[in-house]
């Protein structure tokens, strides 16, 4: 009799464990990210080969895109996308970070950094939870450097 209770208890424990695992898997949502028009370009394939393994100690997260030109790290997600049109002249601040020019555009919930003088452009969205946001940009230097610098530079 006790044997039946034990095996029923073991089955119940196994079922509950499986339900918890499935629930956790279903709870894993991916970050919604739009794929830029030039994401499939040779330049973006080259840049994507240099995405950082971690950003500020944060590991990669799943995104809604299967494109290698789109990547996310951390929660809230730090998002990088390659394949955007190049940024034209702007009054937004322009920063030189380790030889890579970035235009910083303040958003309500963080900062959008876009490479300047590179075609196609790379965009990095940094939520305000990661202040000061520019400190994360060195992680993207190798990816940005994979796209040649054009004539435009930060002043």
PLM region spans:
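Extracytosolic low-complexity repeat regions of secreted or lipid-anchored proteins
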Residues: 91-155
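Sequence contexts marking disulfide-bonded cysteines in secreted/extracellular proteins
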Residues: 29, 43-45, 81-84, 93-95, ...
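C-terminal motif of bacterial Sec signal peptides marking the signal peptidase cleavage site
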Residues: 23-27
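Mature extracytoplasmic domains of secretory-pathway proteins
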Residues: 62-114
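Bacterial N-terminal signal peptides that target proteins for export
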Residues: 2-16
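A short, surface-exposed helix-loop junction/capping segment
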Residues: 28-34
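N-terminal secretory signal peptides
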Residues: 34-82
């Amino acid at each position: 009799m006790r044997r039946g209770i034990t095996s029923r208890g073991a089955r119940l424990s196994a079922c509950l464990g499986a339900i918890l695992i499935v629930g956790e898997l279903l709870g894993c949502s991916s970050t919604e990210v739009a794929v830029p028009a030039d994401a499939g370009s040779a330049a973006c394939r080259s840049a994507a080969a240099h995405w950082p393994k971690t950003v500020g100690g944060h590991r990669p997260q799943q995104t809604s895109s299967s494109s290698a030109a789109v990547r996310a790290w951390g929660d809230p997600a730090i998002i990088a996308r390659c394949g955007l049109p190049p940024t034209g002249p702007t009054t937004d601040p322009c920063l030189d970070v380790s030889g890579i020019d970035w235009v910083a555009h303040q958003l309500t919930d963080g900062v959008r950094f876009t490479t300047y003088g590179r075609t196609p452009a790379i965009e990095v969205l940094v939520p305000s939870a990661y202040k000061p946001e520019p400190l994360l940009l060195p992680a993207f230097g190798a990816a940005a450097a994979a796209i040649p610098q054009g004539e435009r530079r930060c002043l």
